[in-house]
């Protein structure tokens, strides 16, 4: 249940909208929303001891959302500023996994998964409802280290993002509009460390961004939404999965092609590394819930030994 409270408008001290969300079960906010941020210095997402700050480019305009730590009774207070404040607080229940139903997931036969589910009962898949805000950083993350991608994303947001409305932490930004993204010149993609292949993929998405978002909204199934994404040059299976896991809380899409994921899943489930095909075979018994199983593995605390060559951090600004 969500209670929408009146709030004063036009003040940086007082929110433009606020809500109290009372979930049916206690939600682990960091575990649920942790996948959304792109590194510790993401200009759109910042954590502190009291909760999380998140900026949005909503259909009504920019917004800053503050989600506070749950109260003693499990209720979660959220406040928002900016033209998109009402949209942002309305999105809180879905963002915190209200529609993510784990009741059909049976992991009782695997000790690691069973233990992780027991220790993380408040883990849910977050649904942002903002396709482009998940798709563009996923493209930037293609075939490079996380460090490179996070650095590029932060640079582009600092240069072209809009200052966050309200009392957000210094340096927070709202992602550019579609038109502003389209207007970024090739040399600034380059200066941000995004090589020409990824920059072309981003521009290809931006050409059809409006129709792509509409197609994803109207898709009868999440599989159809993934198919729509993969029609764009430069958007493959990995990128579609990384996007829909965040924008639509896709419970089954697995990031096939990830540099480490298959090895990690294999070692966690059977004690040895596997390739992508092996990972999909291991996850097959949980079809329909495979992303949930991956999230349980990630939340389990399992550590695997990274062997072999590491990806080299490259500075594409000088290529």
State each model region's role.
Residues 1-319:
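HhH-family (HhH-GPD) DNA N-glycosylase catalytic core used in base-excision repair
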């Amino acid at each position: 249940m969500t209670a929408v409270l009146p709030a004063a408008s036009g003040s940086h001290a007082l929110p433009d909208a606020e809500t109290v969300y009372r979930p049916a079960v206690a939600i682990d906010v960091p575990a649920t929303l942790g996948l959304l941020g792109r590194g510790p210095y993401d200009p759109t997402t910042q954590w502190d001891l009291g909760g999380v700050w998140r900026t949005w480019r909503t259909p009504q305009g920019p917004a800053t959302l503050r989600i506070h730590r749950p109260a003693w009774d499990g209720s979660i207070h959220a406040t928002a500023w900016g033209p998109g404040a009402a949209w942002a607080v309305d999105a809180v229940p879905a963002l915190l996994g209200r529609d993510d139903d784990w009741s059909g997931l049976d992991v009782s036969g695997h000790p690691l998964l069973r233990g992780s589910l027991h220790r993380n009962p408040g883990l849910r898949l977050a649904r942002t409802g903002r396709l482009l805000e998940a798709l563009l950083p996923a493209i930037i993350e293609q075939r490079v280290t996380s460090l490179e991608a996070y650095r590029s994303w932060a640079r582009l947001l600092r240069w072209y993002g809009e200052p966050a409305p309200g009392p957000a932490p210094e340096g927070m930004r709202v992602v550019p509009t579609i038109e502003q993204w389209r207007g970024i010149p090739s040399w600034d993609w380059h200066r941000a460390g995004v090589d020409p292949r990824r920059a072309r993929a981003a521009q290809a998405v931006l050409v059809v961004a409006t129709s792509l978002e509409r197609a994803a909204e109207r898709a009868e199934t999440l599989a159809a939404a993934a198919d729509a994404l993969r029609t764009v040059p430069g958007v493959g299976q990995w990128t579609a999965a990384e996007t829909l896991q965040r924008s639509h809380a896709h419970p089954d899409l697995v990031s096939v092609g990830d540099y480490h994921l298959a090895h990690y899943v294999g070692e966690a489930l059977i004690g040895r590394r596997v390739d992508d095909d092996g990972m999909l075979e291991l996850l097959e018994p949980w079809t329909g819930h495979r992303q949930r199983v991956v999230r349980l593995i990630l939340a389990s605390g399992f550590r695997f030994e990274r062997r072999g060559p590491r990806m080299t951090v490259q500075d594409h600004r000088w290529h």
